[in-house]
From Swiss-Prot:
It comes from the Bacteria. Belongs to the AIR synthase family. This is Phosphoribosylformylglycinamidine cyclo-ligase. The gene is purM. Pfam families: AIRS (PF00586), AIRS_C (PF02769). It comes from Chelativorans sp. (strain BNC1). CDD domains: PurM.
Length: 368
């Protein structure tokens, strides 16, 4: 049916049902569903309260008290991000309870690399037709991510927009604000040749490169419910939807206890070559021993099944390392010990060297 005729038919049907005129619901927006979602998520939001933020959702804006949070002369740092086409996996698999963790992780990990403590988070959830149960599952993940990061979920926007999205589709965006006391921001200005590069393990693909992941799955002829070829105990969807690791609390602990971290890089889109140079002085480069990278099975499978070259893997995925720390050589063992005690798997990946050309220099080969 042509679009104009279809719209006319819908209008005629609506008018025949309601002789008194059209309603917002006739246009596809269900205010009652929105209210039902708010009631479902109120306890989830309440569970993320922290010093500085103890209000209820529903106001025109969220409040945060920096003094109550213990800051005296803070610099505020803001970040926003999304989850990319990892959402398509969640939508097609009907599994929505973890992408909210990804959303928070992508934002708060970008804050902590600047030495900031995440304080509060806001989300934007847009869909064509609101399903309160689906929305509640998504917000439950967001609340869990906030709990892991120690930040408060102080507000958000749920947008039901008929005609903008296909049935079942949705999009997410996150916004996080953190703070650090003046003079304690990262990177520091004392990075020198010989500083050690530590790598913190990832949980999997995290939230970057999923357009390539989905293409490889497509050409492999696999279904999301099939056992994952690289993890037979879980379905392919479950394995690929493993949430992005949130590094906030272990890193903040290491910063406070050692004062040995000079720089941090969140390994997202662009991998090592695009992200590590962003935190280094122009005169220095990172020399990485690729044989020290513990490549996770999912990346070996993606490389083999998709015929993806090692260099392309390194500039698309994290390949098993989700966060990089640059530390003074004499404090590397201490920093690594604190991170490991906090539950991180840490590898010594290389060191800082004088830069001659590229910002990242590889030694050895990636063991895919």
């Amino acid at each position: 049916m042509p679009i104009a005729r279809e719209r006319k038919a819908r209008l005629e049907n609506a008018m025949s049902r309601k002789k008194t005129g059209l309603s917002y619901a006739d246009a596809g927006v269900d205010i009652d569903a929105g209210n039902a979602l708010v009631e479902k998520i109120k306890p989830l939001v309440r569970a993320t309260r922290r010093p500085g933020a103890d209000g209820e959702i529903g106001g025109f804006g969220g409040l945060f008290d920096l003094k109550a949070a213990g800051f005296t002369d803070p610099i505020l740092i803001a970040a926003n991000d999304g989850v990319g086409t990892k959402l398509k996996v969640a939508i097609e698999a009907g599994k929505h309870d973890t992408v909210g963790i990804d959303l928070v992780a992508m934002c708060v990990n970008d804050l902590v690399v600047q030495g900031a403590e995440p304080l509060f988070f806001l989300d934007y959830f847009a869909t064509g037709k609101l399903d309160p149960d689906q929305g509640a599952a998504i917000v439950a993940g967001i609340a869990e991510g906030c709990r892991q990061a120690g930040c408060a979920l102080i507000g958000g926007e749920t947008a039901e927009m008929p005609g903008m999205y296909r049935d079942g589709d949705y999009d997410l965006a996150g916004f996080a604000v953190g703070a650090a006391e003046r003079g304690r921001l990262l990177p520091t200005n004392d990075i020198v040749e010989g500083d050690v590069i530590l790598g913190l393990a990832s949980t999997g693909v995290h939230s970057n490169g999923f357009s390539l992941v989905r293409r490889i799955v497509e050409v492999s002829g696999l279904d999301w419910n099939d056992p994952a070829p690289f993890d037979s105990d879980r379905s392919l969807a479950e394995a690929l939807l493993t949430p992005t690791r949130i590094y906030v609390k272990p890193i903040l602990s290491a910063i406070a206890r050692t004062h040995g971290i000079k720089a941090l890089a969140h390994i997202t889109g662009g991998g090592f070559p695009e992200n590590i140079p962003r935190v280094l002085p122009p005169a220095y480069a990172a020399e990485i021993d690729l044989e020290a990278v513990n490549v996770l099975p999912v990346f070996s499978w993606l490389a083999e099944r998709g015929g993806v070259a090692a260099q392309e893997m390194l500039r698309t995925f994290n390949c098993g390392i989700g966060m990089i720390a640059v530390v003074a050589a004499g404090q590397a063992a201490q920093v690594a010990a604190v991170l490991q005690k906090e539950g991180e798997h840490v590898e010594i990946l290389g060191s800082i060297v004088p830069r001659r050309d590229k910002g990242v220099i590889y030694q050895g080969a990636l063991e895919l």
